[in-house]
Amino acid sequence: MISANNITLRLGKKALFEDVNVKFTEGNCYGLIGANGAGKSTFLKILSGQLEPTSGDIVITPGQRLSFLQQDHFKYDEYTVLDTVIMGNKRLYDIMKEKDAIYMKEDFSDEDGIRASELEAEFADMDGWNAESDAATLLNGLGIPTEDHCTQMADLPGAAKVKVLLAQALFGNPDILLLDEPTNHLDLDAIAWLEEFLINFENTVIVVSHDRYFLNKVCTNIADMDYGKIQLYAGNYDFWYESSQLLVRQMKEANKKKEEKIKELQEFISRFSANASKSKQATSRKRALEKIQLDDIRPSSRKYPYIDFRPNREIGNEVLTVDGISKTIDGVKVLDNISFIVGHDDKIAFVGGNELAKTTLFKILAGEMEPDEGSYKWGVTTSQSYFPKDNTAIFDSDELIVDWLTQYSEIKDATYVRGFLGRMLFAGEDGVKKMRVLSGGEKVRVLLSRMMIMGSNVLIFDEPTDHLDMESITALNNGMIKFPGVILFACRDHQVVQTTANRIIEFLPDGSMVDKVSTYDEYLESDVMARKRQVYNTTADEEADD
């Protein structure tokens, strides 16, 4: 168990938290939610001891081990992947290294023998003999192949490092597990594996995530952070949403009845307070009036952008033909003879762990990269808007947001363009910010503004939910569902994929693909996925036997 007692954190004159009291108990998974800037990640740092609060204290049950997801992707570059995971249990890792150092000695003394015996006993008590196989199981589950387990962390790409650090946090069955955005940079298969892991995890979990489906799957409780306070709700994210909405409605209805009662009492008092025969009744009603207190209903600090993609032209029947596209990058065949035809009502989700293949295809279709072989042809009625995963070059500019966005608008009017920015929560002077100073979430909202203002009938999204808060993801999800054109997209948010896509294309590790007309959940239950799981399980069993 871990509890926060009277936690206050002040940043200058502003109090991010004020006298927060909350207890997280064993056997529960708590989803910590709140608007961007509410302090979710900061609160996890306080719980983990990485940050000292202004006042108050954190209490952990004596003897319990706390583990948290490291955010520094370069911290373990000098270590192997396997060692990095095992370091999730520092005491166990230290024992392993001390044992190895003793056994490497050429002048092995009696004292060394006694110390080695003590370490071996503690090592056995901690199930140390299974440490490497346990670490390998976590890595395989998250999609890190066995051949990479002895690789130096410095040699891994960023997305793989995130998976290793997540495996480190999960390693060794910690008593308290703190996870800050664990699904970031995970493909949908890895997220599904993590969901099952957390569902079966018997200790305390506190997780920050913007993935609604993930929170619904794993959470037993929701910790809602708003106005510097934390309110606990039993149930998952959807239950919290319904409960919080119901509570507000009930308070509004109660206030309405109170206001009607106040009006009735005030009318009686004003009519009869000067009447001698009614003076006692008027006095009684004054006392009753003084006792009535309206509930203080504060509007949530959460803000929802308005996302509405409206094509300027209706799309025809011929949309896109992809014929035999292949592409090799750095000696690796990323796309291998890819062919498919897109219909006028297709919303295609590209899934699977091969993120480079998806990004490469989108770049080719957007005209930013040439294929090595094959061709593609857009229909004459189509117009495309592309949301790139890497937007670094776009925002490396001192241009003002409103000026940059105006170039994509048919109507060259600043007021008109500011209207789109306003829908995306850029209020007042935000529109004259320079491009290079924007935060990750602001950059995404600017790119979505561009897609809305262009009025294209084909939208290409490469991981659009990265850096967005839950409110923005919900708005984007609704906009994608309502869009009457064609969408080609890759997204880590299960709910976005499930509610938007009517066709699934999965790129396999060898560069080939599977194409199936279905929702995402239907695809996961399909024969194709069953065969994939069978191959994976067989491989895992063979590795375990080795």
What are these regions (language model features)?
Residues N130, S277-Q281, K291-S301, K377, ...:
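Proline-centered turn/helix-capping motifs that create local helix->coil transitions or kinks
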Residues S243-D296:
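Intracellular alpha-helical coupling/juxtamembrane segments of multi-pass membrane proteins
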Residues M1-N255, D308-D546:
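ABC ATP-binding cassette signature C-motif
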Residues P305:
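Conserved catalytic-core segments of large NTP-driven translation/proteostasis enzymes
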